[in-house]
Amino acid sequence: MPLEQHVIVQADEYTEPEVLDLYRRDGNGEQTTKLNAELINRLDQLDRKAARRRGEERPDKRKGFGRGRGGKGAKGHAPKAERHTPRRWAVVDELNFLGMLPGIYFIFSRNGCDQAVEQCINAGLELTTDEEVTRIRRIVDEMVEGQLTQEDLKALQFSKFRFALEEGFASHHAGMIALFRQIVERLFEEGLVKMVFATETLAL
């Protein structure tokens, strides 16, 4: 299956994310190795907009980097454009809308993975159907039965873990017990968990 490479851009938290091709397409609609001019122009527009919001003008490359003999802005640093990285829940919501799930979102931080799940839950995203929720509960109950005591389940915040699974979300990292990672892998393989926020512990 060919790998489609896209970039999701969001101007701010109040606007819908935009999905743009990373590379240009040829006359046959196939991606080339050249960067998409539309993407470059869009990012440039956002940079200029961010600079205006800060009361700064984007420096003209022909004139150096702005004020002062050093050719730089305040404190000797070139002005930095704001990042245009969409919120994680917004990325998931857009991918779901486009029918591009299940998916894996790699985050190189255990806390980052857990926080991403919470962000999606708090945003009210639900990626599963009633039928899928029933299947998730059955599989989770089967895998947990006899493996952990009630005290263990409480200490591991099992109810929170299970609720996220039922909504279609999961973390996967070395800070989780092996059983929880196995549950996530099983549900993802069966297409029941739609988005996994993972560190390098999840092999493709």
Regions found by a protein language model. Name each.
Residues 112, 178, 203-204:
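Glycine-rich nucleotide phosphate-binding loop and flanking beta-alpha elements
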Residues 1-119, 163, 170:
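Conserved interdomain linker/interface between the two RecA-like ATPase lobes of SF2 helicase motors
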Residues 96, 121, 188-189, 203:
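Signal for well-folded cores of large energy- and translation-related assemblies
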Residues 1, 197-204:
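Ser/Thr-glycine-rich phosphate-binding loops at phosphate-binding pockets of nucleotides
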Residues 36, 127-129, 177:
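Ser/Thr-centered flexible coil motifs
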Residues 150-200:
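Conserved helicase ATPase core of P-loop NTP-dependent helicases/translocases
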Residues 120-162:
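Alpha-helical "lid/cap" subdomains adjacent to substrate-binding clefts that gate access
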